[in-house]
């Protein structure tokens, strides 16, 4: 095999190898189903929560998107808002905020919890 054939063979091999190495897994990802399609095609007979797309009976039953790290504070108009659980090193307070019944009712001075949210809602902050 002469020198020119070897050069051509090496070049062809390099083209194939580079095509494999640099184009590997380059197929475009399939786009996620748009939010609007999920919302409109949910088949929910009750209320469809906008944040989580959970189907519930009433708006006040909607869960927070991240329940392990959020408190669901119910407002006087029966709407709700999800806030981050207060960061504290007090184990008793952490236990209260982790309790799904006690956490949303907690009102501790100096801590931005659901009690603080209600005061802010009533323009008392």
UniProtKB/Swiss-Prot annotation:
Function in brief: Probable component of the endoplasmic reticulum-associated degradation (ERAD) pathway.
Organism: Zygosaccharomyces rouxii (strain ATCC 2623 / CBS 732 / NBRC 1130 / NCYC 568 / NRRL Y-229)
The keyword Signal is assigned to this record: yes
Keywords from the UniProt entry: Signal
GO biological process terms, semicolon-separated: ERAD pathway
Protein name (record): Long chronological lifespan protein 2
Listed PANTHER family: LONG CHRONOLOGICAL LIFESPAN PROTEIN 2
Signal peptide: 1-19
Domain of life the protein comes from: Eukaryota
Family: Belongs to the LCL2 family.
Keyword flag Signal: yes
InterPro entries xref list: LCL2 (IPR034543)
